[in-house]
Amino acid sequence: MLAARLSRPLSQLPGKALSVRDRENGTRHTLLFYPASFSPDTRRTYASQADAASGKAILITGCDSGFGFSLAKHLHSKGFLVFAGCLMKDKGDAGVKELDSLKSDRLRTIQLNVCNSEEVEKAVETIRSGLKDPEKGMWGLVNNAGISTFGEVEFTSMETYKEVAEVNLWGTVRTTKSFLPLLRRAKGRVVNISSMLGRMANPARSPYCITKFGIEAFSDCLRYEMHPLGVKVSVVEPGNFIAATSLYSPERIQAIAKKMWDDLPEVVRKDYGRKYFDEKIAKMETYCNSGSTDTSSVINAVTHALTAATPYTRYHPMDYYWWLRMQIMTHFPGAISDKIYIH
């Protein structure tokens, strides 16, 4: 049936005309999209769940807030033994206190800065000693820790590029390498939280995009290498969930913008001007107030990647606008996506 469907001309496939508004500038474009059944909605309800978690050990990084915090509570409720890596555990962060308040033997917060090799290795030993049988290994690693920033290339310092990469990319690589021996013993799972911006670049987000593109490549290489060893590697590419992750408050955006402007070379300030700079910051504020506050699609995707007998290579929890934009930017010639999204 599938072969017959794919062999039919596009004019005979179920499709629909879409009026697509570019969220960067308000311009509308009408596209004829085929086929309707390939929308992200078809991947939001997952089947083929494996056996219950039954105490399998999972490490999640970045559990102080956002996706990691929600994942820790959700996976604990599913029966996993959850080790919640928290950057601010030693400082008594509110998120850490809430997780600790559950007072469960199956949910343990641990101090973990993914940029610090000593803390990562200490986490390995803490988890190894917390396993009933270390020789059977650890079932899952969810690389969720990450930071974000904004600013056009000429507005962004090299220090910012390095800082974002150290957490998002090298932190993921460092943590994965350290835990692979335990994961190999369990023939377990690695789930890397990337982003839709790991598949399609976006203006004013180059430091973040670079790191997420890097996670995509790292995950593909790792998946190829781990396949013969029985370890499955998946990537989750969330859409716009900024409103749900508390990455930016209006005050934080203004603080970043002030420092960015103050640190700009004089020639850049003169050539672009304050009006242009302020307009870009205003757009960023609008973007940060948008997006979904319901993270359940991300939580469900990670859960499926950890529990399904045959997890997907990639998961796309995002709304239709961003999913369609990603398909256009990754599957169509660049000239077409440029015509639609660059003006």
Curated annotation (Swiss-Prot):
PROSITE patterns: ADH_SHORT (PS00061). GO terms for molecular function: 3-hydroxybutyrate dehydrogenase activity. GO terms for biological process: lipid metabolic process. One of its GO terms (cellular component) is mitochondrion. It is found in: Mitochondrion inner membrane; Mitochondrion matrix. Pfam families: adh_short. This is D-beta-hydroxybutyrate dehydrogenase, mitochondrial. The gene is Bdh1.
